[in-house]
Amino acid sequence: GDRQAPEGFYHVTPALMNPNSSYHLSFNMGFPNAYDRANDRTGSFLMIHGACSSAGCYSMTDEYVEEIYALAREAFKGGQKSFQIQALPFRLTPENMAKHVNSNNFEFWTMLKEGSDYFELTKQPPKVDVCEKRYVFNRAVAEGERFSTRTECPLTEMPRSLATAFATRPSSRAISNLIV
């Protein structure tokens, strides 16, 4: 890649789809999201598109963007309100994380790993919120509480079944055991 495109969790709605793109087909991935704005990241029109060339966007062949675009279009026709994009640097397995433990981005990638692990465990997109300028995943807050991007996180709870599944996943300890 061009090392300019952001990483994180994004949601695409029908309004972000662009069938008239100069790059064949495209859709705006919704950058900046709440996390990006809380961390003063700016920009706009970060697109996923065809034409296989880009600066700051995610490009792919026309064939691949047509496939993704068709799936999104049909999901929206079927009543789905949005779809999630997980823009990750690599598969966030313990082995891959161990290879990058000295990266300046390791702490950020560890945060993203929680959302990625949820998807791998459940095959469902994680519920994503932001508080204290960080992502939080699959958390429920008490009635009357809410997440705020720049303030302290409210008390949260993870559903018991999910907490049990997370307790059995390869963790940070597994990553440290792989570091040579």
Please state what every model-predicted region is:
Residues G1-C153:
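Exported/periplasmic cell-wall-interacting domains
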Residues E157-V180:
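C-terminal non-catalytic accessory extensions
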